[in-house]
């Protein structure tokens, strides 16, 4: 709706999504605030990641945190099947966000805003999604710290350039873009 209005001045629009954070409720076996996700037969759930096993060189504090902080890491007793269902649910939550982002992209298309629009997409952190038998954040595993930063410049909707550098996710985008 906001993007359909005529704007006389440049504008800054922020769309912030709760998901896939609701995976925390799933791990705690709590209801989701926006409706639960039906879990299919285990045969239809994704497999385990190649790095599912805990690393023998992981710091002892990581395992201690996992075992002794059940409210944050209720997955310590998860079976491989539990992890597969967790991964299925996580991916469905990501798809929910994808659909919401699609609405914004479609509105930019409908209103011919690409010539004067910068779109920035990022996240604060990833989730272990079963790698190293880990969920949540708090550990410096690749799955958690390697998050997307996608930027489209005016008139460059499908430029398609990928850079391998790791970018800090603590960037103040508003101040950076306005500079």
Place the predicted regions along the sequence by residue.
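Active-site-proximal cap/lid insertion segments
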Residues: 5-9, 17-116, 120-167
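Zinc-coordinating Cys/His ligand positions in small cysteine/histidine-rich zinc-finger domains
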Residues: 170, 174
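Oxidoreductase and adenylate-handling cofactor-binding alpha/beta cores
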Residues: 178-179
